[in-house]
Amino acid sequence: SKKCRQFINISQSFKAFFTVMLNQRTNPVYVKIKELINGNELGKVHRFQWTITNWFRTNYYYQTSNWRAKWESEGGGVLINQSIHQLDLCQWLFGMPDSVYTDLGLGRFHEIEVEDEVTSIFKYKNGLKGVFITTTGEAPGVNRLEIASDKGLITIQDNNVTWEKIDSSTEFIKNSKTLFDMPKKEKINFNFKDDLDQHIEHQRLIQNF
């Protein structure tokens, strides 16, 4: 906090902008998901699960800088250093949860005092439930977000987005006279390769100033 205050004071003396940015909000993948949710194209969102475990780190990584993985100097582990962007996206996409239950491992995989493994369950007033899993101790790991809604399932893995779209699971449950049938689905793939190749997240943030 002391160093942060120094940076703020310096920026003010030069009348310059000084900010901490969460650039993933401008990632075209999540911008599209935000549009689908806000436009009610997914219907009611029932559940999401984000498994972000491709942050694999070694003991040597934590030993290279004295500030790493210490409560006093970093303030936490995988949640504050690596997965802070995904936590921010959870809040941006789905809102603030009403309650959070978390089971975390302090130095489960590494010789550190802070968390390197986390499993959290988010509960929301509207009935939505979310699961968030992250660690720096699994290899090869995965980055996968599932969003289950009344209009089907969206899967985002390594920036590949697939929507298995249906009319309405709620209406099908109410009105179907079959035992095991499921609603017909349409598979939609979204392609963001060109935008992602240009690394436009930081560009958009800078343009926003």
Predicted regions and their residues:
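Predominantly a Rossmann-like dinucleotide-binding segment in NAD(P)-dependent oxidoreductases
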Residues: 16-17, 24-111
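Glycine-rich phosphate/pyrophosphate-binding beta-alpha loops
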Residues: 84, 109, 133-141
